[in-house]
Design a protein with these regions (language model features):
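N-terminal glycine-rich phosphate/adenylate-binding segment common to multiple enzyme folds
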Residues: 1-92, 180
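Single conserved hydrophobic/aromatic residue that forms the stacking wall/gate
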Residues: 3, 235, 242-245
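Glycine-rich phosphate-binding loop
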Residues: 4-19, 144, 150-208
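A generic local secondary-structure boundary/capping motif
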Residues: 51-57, 110-113, 162-166
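Acidic-glycine-rich active-site phosphate/pyrophosphate-binding loop
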Residues: 204-218
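Short pre-catalytic strand/loop immediately N-terminal to key active-site residues, enriched for Gly-Thr
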Residues: 220-227
Length: 246
């Protein structure tokens, strides 16, 4: 049964009642980590009928994928607070990049790029400022690229990469990034197509040992709660189930 192999996850959160970091760590991040959904796949595509905020862009001009590492990186839970409420107060949170964690997301990204017509991959980095983890990321990208000789690849520091998303979105095909950088880019990309309101997101366990999870990118919109105007399953052609949960 297809419904036993995947999870449809609606937007969650009510910032006025519960801080976002609590609702996120207590729900979505638990799914990602406990089900080893290490790939976050975000298609970025300008759809017919949705005007892009970028000048002279039409459907077909913006069409690429963002692959985000989804279970480690900058969003690790390793860290803490010392000397709270004193002048010596210190907070720390460590970035974790394992070889297996980095390589498996890079392998997925290169394989996807190899299946596309453009056969091009872009890596997001910041190795000119983050002096340990990002040079390691670059090293693993270069090593993985040797296994995919047909794929052309390049890398950009995250700041200028954001600028290119706005100025030259048509140049991209597959973009691969660490957890934090991928999180930023996967909102910026859909925004360039006119709205994040219809942007999809997949949290994937490619080996299918665990179910994958699919969600909208947009927020929970608590301001329209109780009005009966949110059609949460219509977009996946499930009107019957929509009626059940409405």
């Amino acid at each position: 049964d297809v419904y036993k192999r995947q999870i449809f996850f609606g937007s969650v959160g009510w910032p006025e009642k519960i801080p976002d970091h609590i609702s996120l760590w207590g729900s979505l991040l638990k799914f990602r980590r406990e089900f080893d959904q290490y790939i976050n796949l975000r298609p970025v595509k300008l759809m017919p009928g949705v005007p892009s905020p970028l000048a002279n862009r039409k459907p077909g001009d913006i069409d690429f994928y963002i692959i985000r590492e989804n279970t480690e990186g900058e969003y690790s839970s390793i860290g803490g607070k010392m000397f709270p409420d004193t002048e010596r107060e210190i907070v720390m949170q460590e970035t974790i990049m394992s070889r297996v964690g980095v390589d498996r997301v890079l392998k997925f990204a290169f394989e996807l790029a190899n299946k596309t017509e453009k056969k091009h991959l872009t890596s997001a980095t910041k190795s000119n400022g983050i002096s340990i983890t990002m040079p390691y990321w670059d090293e693993r990208v270069e090593n993985m690229a040797k296994q995919y000789s047909e794929v052309k690849w390049d890398k950009y520091h995250i700041d200028i990469l954001c600028a290119h998303f706005v100025l030259n979105p048509d140049k991209f095909n597959v973009v691969v990034a660490s957890n934090l950088f991928g999180d930023i880019l996967s909102d910026l990309g859909p925004a360039c197509t006119g709205t994040i309101g219809i942007a999809p997101s997949g949290n994937i366990n490619p080996e299918k040992k665990f179910p994958s999870l699919f969600e909208p990118v947009h927020g929970s919109a608590p301001d329209i709660a109780g009005q009966g105007i949110a059609l949460s399953l219509i977009h996946i052609s499930e009107p019957t189930r929509q009626e059940v949960i409405s």
